[in-house]
């Protein structure tokens, strides 16, 4: 632990000196956190979770993601990398991006499903990205949620480098609304309320404690298959087409 504390201070000192030599410009500092106790806890808003439950929509953990015991709507995702801007004038660190590579979620309705994998946080745009998978394929680094930074980055070097921040009011981007509506086969009423839904909060906490057994390899989530009834419908359409060709 003393080694981690010393290393963290040396790293910050080195970048501070670099920033000083570069004047007021910020220097990007990328920190791999796969082997640190770095977690992002995603909690669905209670009202949105209740509505999703009534609509028959459920959420399941994939890859590194773990469901919090006793809850169907809270998930922990290991943070694998963060990038900060270090500046000397004024002295400080500001978040640039963060990644939870290897983590994923499956969102499933009674008639369809989609997957979200390899989450990223873009603090320049305040957007959460993920590889979005549907029966049509996978869209890499898709803009899923817009968010508000409720509690800005808090950094401490006491006992080692630690960071914490809180994101709230996560709402679907316009592109994600269209993908959710199509993939989950939502009815018109459900589609109309998508823009108004708060999908919850994300709490990020990083401490200098070591951890093992976390993979930072990209998660390749299985592409959700069309629902059984939709597949049956396509099969019947195919049989009808063949029968018509034979009659002609």
Task: List where the protein language model places each region.
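Short, charged juxtamembrane terminal tails flanking transmembrane helices
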Residues: 245-248
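Predominantly extracellular/secreted and cell-surface proteins with exposed
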Residues: 64-149
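N-terminal segment immediately downstream of the Sec signal-peptide cleavage site
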Residues: 26-97, 177, 186-222
């Amino acid at each position: 632990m003393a080694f981690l504390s010393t290393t963290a201070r040396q790293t910050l000192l080195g970048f501070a000196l670099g920033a000083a030599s570069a004047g007021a410009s910020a220097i990007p500092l990328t920190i791999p956190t796969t082997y640190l106790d770095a977690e992002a806890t995603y909690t669905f808003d209670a009202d949105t979770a209740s509505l999703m439950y009534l609509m028959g929509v459920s959420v399941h953990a994939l890859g590194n993601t773990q469901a919090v015991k006793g809850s169907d709507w809270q998930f922990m995702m290991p943070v694998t990398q963060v990038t900060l801007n270090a500046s000397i004038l004024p002295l400080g660190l500001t978040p640039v991006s963060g990644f939870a590579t290897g983590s994923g979620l499956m969102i499933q309705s009674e008639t369809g499903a989609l997957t979200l994998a390899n989450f990223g946080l873009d603090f320049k745009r305040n957007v959460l990205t993920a590889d979005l998978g549907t029966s049509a394929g996978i869209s890499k680094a898709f803009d899923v949620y817009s968010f508000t930074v409720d509690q800005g980055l808090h950094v401490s070097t006491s006992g080692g480098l630690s960071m914490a921040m809180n994101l709230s009011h996560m709402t679907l981007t316009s592109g994600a609304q269209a993908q959710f509506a199509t993939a989950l086969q939502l009815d018109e009423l459900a589609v109309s309320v998508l823009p108004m839904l708060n999908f919850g909060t994300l709490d990020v906490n990083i401490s200098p404690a070591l951890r093992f057994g976390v993979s930072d390899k990209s998660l390749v989530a299985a592409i959700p298959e069309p629902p059984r009834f939709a597949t049956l419908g396509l099969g019947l359409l195919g049989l009808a087409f063949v029968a018509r060709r034979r009659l002609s």
